[in-house]
């Protein structure tokens, strides 16, 4: 499996603002090898970083984009599901039974759900709200999403084992078409080698290795 090494920091109190300016991000490894295996167009730069202390793991997406799209809908999940977003999926093993999904739009709204194989989704499940925090900022040519998740919640869900978290890292980019509709380009860290875009399979996951 593809591996990303999550460095540790001695900084104890870390407040995320979603602006990318906290000094801890300079300590983290940078992951930029994202692609859309189903699309010939060049993918604009996506930079993913993660770092942890004894209490929490912190994730950051910095995404080059000068035209972010948010789908207008009264229903939050319907809106996020059709908008520019970043995604983290976590599994305890490759059976995907279950796995947990966080899909976050450019304004920092979360669509979180528990899933089982064959896209069986439970939207009544939520990541415990006191164990996760999300902040974001949108700029002229890029947006940033930062996520803080408690180590304890990852252990409770059996997702952090022996310093490893099996993780999928994704992005949905919505592009305006000639008829003014918006269609997604599906972007992933690990190429699942499927004919059509599908992140909800075991081949789309890699490993975060906590140091």
What are these model-predicted stretches?
Residues 1-211:
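Structural preference for beta-rich elements and adjacent junctions enriched in aromatics
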